[in-house]
Design a protein with these regions (language model features):
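Post-transcriptional modification and biogenesis factors for structured RNAs
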Residues: 1-160
Length: 160
């Protein structure tokens, strides 16, 4: 991602922090995770975020082999709707997203197209949803299927 996407990165970081989801960052990033604009985009959630960095996509896939993990690849080319997966009994779920401009690498999609690709249904008017919106939609579907386990049910900011 280049610098014009710092708000997208901040939104993704905030979604991960507020849902207790680990954020895996795969290098090369195209940005520094300590730059002021990234922290500003992540608001006050950046220090509450669990981050794991990987030197490359290959290193990530070696550490977390898709065949041995509950791993899905989010893409507009996906064979399965993200809501058709039963996440409810999965302890750990990995959802990989590609670059905002290009998506996931073609070789990866070809390898896992029939088994592990998921998509968000949308009208064919535009290329895709904003990346941070996609992350939020799929993350909350996983949480919904798990009955929002460990999530706060009622706001703590008002007396009920």
């Amino acid at each position: 991602m280049n610098r014009k996407y710092h708000k997208t990165r901040g939104n993704i970081a905030r979604t991960c922090a507020i849902t207790g989801s680990k954020l895996h960052l795969v290098h090369p990033l195209g940005f520094k995770i300590d730059e002021k604009s990234l922290k500003r985009a992540g608001l006050d959630y950046w220090d509450k975020l669990e981050i794991e960095e990987h030197n490359s996509l290959e290193d990530f896939l070696k550490k977390y082999p898709p065949e041995e993990n509950n791993m899905f690849f989010a893409t507009t080319k996906g064979k399965t709707k993200y809501t058709d997966i039963d996440y409810s009994k999965m302890d750990e779920v990995f959802i990989l997203y590609g670059k905002e401009t290009k998506g996931l690498p073609e070789w990866l999609l070809k390898k896992y197209l029939d088994k592990k690709t998921i998509r968000i249904p949308m009208l064919p008017l535009l290329r895709s949803l904003n990346l941070s919106n996609s992350v939020c939609v799929i993350t909350y579907e996983i949480l919904r299927q798990k009955n929002f386990e460990n999530m706060q049910e009622i706001s703590q900011y008002f007396d009920n």
